[in-house]
Amino acid sequence: MLTPILALTALALIAGALLGFAAVRFRVEGNPIADQVDAVLPQTQCGQCGFGGCRPYAEAIAAGEAEINRCPPGGQDTVQTLADLLGVEPLPLDEERGEAPHTPQVAWVDEAVCIGCTRCIQACPVDAILGAAKQMHTVLKGECTGCGLCVDPCPVDCIHMVPVDLDLAEWHWPLPQNDTARREVA
């Protein structure tokens, strides 16, 4: 009775040691440049750049497959920060992708008009819209990134982008990085 238990324990220890060695030996490192670029992007996950989100866009920039000027939510400030980070010339913002918002915006649902079709919920990349089929929907203001992807799918046009008051009670966007923090990322 004791022999099978000891044999299985020994096999488990050997398999665990082999898996541990393989995890260390064959570890896949992430691209540190893509990590730095991703830290600069606004994380709206809007897809206006032509990629599925901010991380795929950062990986394309790091691989040299995409220009640094394709992020309308980040605006020209993000283009300048990316140019400084990568040591390239800043390009003007690609206006074909959309305009940079002058003030942060969030989605607002006119609940009296909402028919509960759930199309906006499916379109939201950050799950900032609450609701169920045939029920009214609402936007979690603190979670909304202002990408606007929920506006077009709405069949009754009850979703509007409204500016956010820029006071301390409503400020949910990351503060601008100073030069010291930027050097730590680099």
UniProtKB/Swiss-Prot annotation:
Top-level class of the enzyme under EC nomenclature: translocase
Chief subcellular location: membrane
Co-factor binding comment: Binds 3 [4Fe-4S] clusters.
Query: What GO cellular component entries does it have?
Result: plasma membrane
Sorted alphabetically, the keyword list is: 4Fe-4S, Cell inner membrane, Cell membrane, Electron transport, Iron, Iron-sulfur, Membrane, Metal-binding, Repeat, Translocase, Transport
**Annotated region (Hydrophobic), positions in chain:** 1-23
What GO annotations for molecular function exist for this entry?
A: 4 iron, 4 sulfur cluster binding; electron transfer activity; metal ion binding
Enumerate the subcellular locations listed in this protein's record, separating them with semicolons: Cell inner membrane
| Record flagged with keyword Transferase | no
Q: What is its EC number?
A: 7.-.-.-
4Fe-4S ferredoxin-type domain location is 105-134, 135-164
Occurrences of domain 4Fe-4S (ranges): 29-88
Which cofactor does this sequence's record say it needs? [4Fe-4S] cluster
Q: Where does [4Fe-4S] cluster 2 bind?
A: C114, C117, C120, C154
Subunit structure and binding partners: The complex is composed of six subunits: RnfA, RnfB, RnfC, RnfD, RnfE and RnfG.
The record's family statement is: Belongs to the 4Fe4S bacterial-type ferredoxin family. RnfB subfamily.
Described function: Part of a membrane-bound complex that couples electron transfer with translocation of ions across the membrane.
Q: What is this protein called?
A: Ion-translocating oxidoreductase complex subunit B
Q: Which gene encodes it?
A: rnfB
